[in-house]
Amino acid sequence: MTTALHSLQVQREDTILKILAEGEWIGADTVPADVAGWQQRGWIFGVEAEGQRYFARYQFDDRDQPLPVIREILAELGPATDPWTIAAWFHFPNGWIVEEGCTAPIAPKDALDRHVAVVDAARRFRGTFGA
């Protein structure tokens, strides 16, 4: 493995660890039975770590149902070969979503109540490498 390729792999692993450590994740065994169907229909996304499937808690409402805005965001992001790319998009601050009255970018997962802004940010992201 080349040094550059190894460096990218280490960076990816560090990013995954950061996303897992800083987020609230629930295991496939603690989510509703419909979760596989929801994921297949593009209503939610899941990631795999250490042989287990995990789902970001922010995708669900208080009754453990998928938030409709997640489906819209995933549709705008388009098909991704790597679910960790989707997780990273939700997790890290996005230049197209800023705090009200300020210019500091915020993470899409923290702006899900700002429907138009997060869906627009997903639309703008599609086909790019970042915000």
Over which residues does each language-model region extend?
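Non-transmembrane "mature" sequence context
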Residues: M1-A131
